[in-house]
A protein has these predicted regions:
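Beta-propeller domain segments
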Residues: 2-6, 10-23, 33-34, 39-194, ...
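Blade-level signature of beta-propeller repeat domains, shared across WD40, Kelch, NHL, RCC1
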Residues: 200-206
Length: 206
């Protein structure tokens, strides 16, 4: 997808669902600008996703999100972010969205509050649910999320870390905390030596 625009292809900025034999192709969820990480929750088997927001609304907007994807969901792009907060269409490149229609306003009311919001431009990548026993009990079924960007790019926050997302299986009562940090030694892009992207657990639970 583009930074913010009205997609001409109805399958852009979506999640598509297929049967195991590749038949039954259909749009499952819409309004995802850049959903990089996808994972099934080990308890509920629901699909979770990470999303990267647009870039021209400053260092603090919009927040990135992690959320559960359910059939028919509208996740906000290209109209709103956070929870039904309109994007800034006074920014010149975003004016191509205008005019905002009644259909847009109705669609925006379907935008749900995400399980978790994190600082703008953190660039959440992979999401991995931990089912091992190597870590303390609270990590069982928690989600590890990799963030490959932060302050050295556009964000006003450090970033460049792997965080642990704790919540109930339905996504409520979510909290997020750093798990692995130290990939950024200073404040510039040259000071970043690691860009976390994906994670996996081994049979030993590490």
């Amino acid at each position: 997808t583009c930074d913010i625009c009205r997609e001409e292809d109805p399958e852009r900025a979506t999640i598509l669902e297929f049967n195991a034999d590749s038949s039954g192709r259909r749009v499952f969820a819409t309004g995802l600008r850049n959903a990089v990480g996808l994972a099934l929750h080990p308890v509920t088997n629901e699909l979770w996703a990470t999303n990267n927001g647009h870039d021209r609304e400053g260092r603090s907007l919009p927040p990135e999100w992690i959320d559960i994807m359910r059939d028919g969901d509208f996740m906000g792009y290209p109209l709103v972010h956070s929870h039904q907060v309109w994007n800034d269409f006074e920014i010149e490149p975003y004016q191509r969205i205008l005019p905002i229609t009644d259909a847009d306003r109705t669609l925006a009311t379907r935008h749900k509050r995400p399980v978790a919001l994190v600082p703008a431009h953190y660039a959440p990548m992979g999401i991995h649910f931990y089912t091992g026993n190597q870590f303390p009990t609270r990590y069982k079924n928690a989600a590890f999320v990799a963030f490959r960007a932060g302050k050295a790019k556009l964000s006003s926050h450090p970033g460049y870390m792997v965080s642990a997302l704790f919540s109930t299986p339905d996504g409520s009562n979510a909290t997020i905390a750093p798990f692995i940090t130290g990939f950024q030694a200073g404040t510039t892009q040259d000071d970043v030596w690691g860009f976390p992207v994906g994670m996996i657990s081994d049979d030993a639970g590490s």
